[in-house]
């Protein structure tokens, strides 16, 4: 004798809600990742990295510094400020990616500094109209 099993109507609804929650959890960091640089690791010299609202601030304390980044993008309406010791200070920003490879850098927002800032990305760098 075979019996038929029916799935209660609540299960598909729960699955939809779970799928939407997972999608939102994945999309939020991805959107942030496109707006400001992330995954910064100071590998030479002295510098600290902080975030407040739509701005990332790099406070450089030595004449030269190197930061390896997972991703370095500046979205429209966002900004990155480099506070350096003086006008001849130099900072090298290398985009090294993460376990998923390297994405091209896109600068659509503000990038300001009082010294010299270099960005190196082997996948390429694009400056948009709003940069």
Language model: regions and residue ranges:
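Solvent-exposed adhesion/ligand-recognition segments of exported proteins
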Residues: 2-131
